[in-house]
Amino acid sequence: MQSADNLIWIDLEMTGLDVDSCKIIEIAAIITDKDLNIIAEAEPIAIYQPDEVLANMNEWCIKTHTETGLTQRVKDSKISTEAAEQQILEFIRKFVPYQSSPLCGNSIWQDRRFLAKYMPNIDEYCHYRMLDVTTLKLLNQYWGDGKSFEKKNTHKALDDIRESIAELKFYRQKLLSI
């Protein structure tokens, strides 16, 4: 059911951080209500990229995406960037009206840059505002007790979103008391 109070959480895995030379290789999405209760999850989608794109990954990406199995999933995938965008957009539309939800996540500006370039329909569907959990992490480092949320950092898109939601709940209780 659509609600303007629902939140769109997206995480991308990419071949690197340079939006001009790197590509999206995985996308996942979760919809929560405003109290951060999960309403629905979209299965993570591995996006096909040719070998020459994967060959240009840096050492960190090669190691991490190989260890998680994502590199092989990308090679085996038949799903294009455009098809993945359409699937995620259809999922979001079921729960969130056009431009009513900020894009939510950790360091979400980086994901937003890739969405703007490679999945512009998702980028446009989200409100221009962003809810970046990393901001609260930094505020806690600067003004709080410095005790951070413990993350597993699996670098799997759906896991990363779940962790971002849990992290926001942690900081909501710790810093905001609301």
Swiss-Prot record:
Lineage: Bacteria, Pseudomonadati, Pseudomonadota, Gammaproteobacteria, Thiotrichales
Domain of life: Bacteria
Domain Exonuclease: 7-168
Name under which the protein is recorded: Oligoribonuclease
Organism of this sequence: Francisella tularensis subsp. holarctica (strain LVS)
GO MF annotation terms: 3'-5'-RNA exonuclease activity; nucleic acid binding
Enzyme Commission number: 3.1.15.-
GO CC terms of this entry: cytoplasm
Keyword check for Nuclease: yes
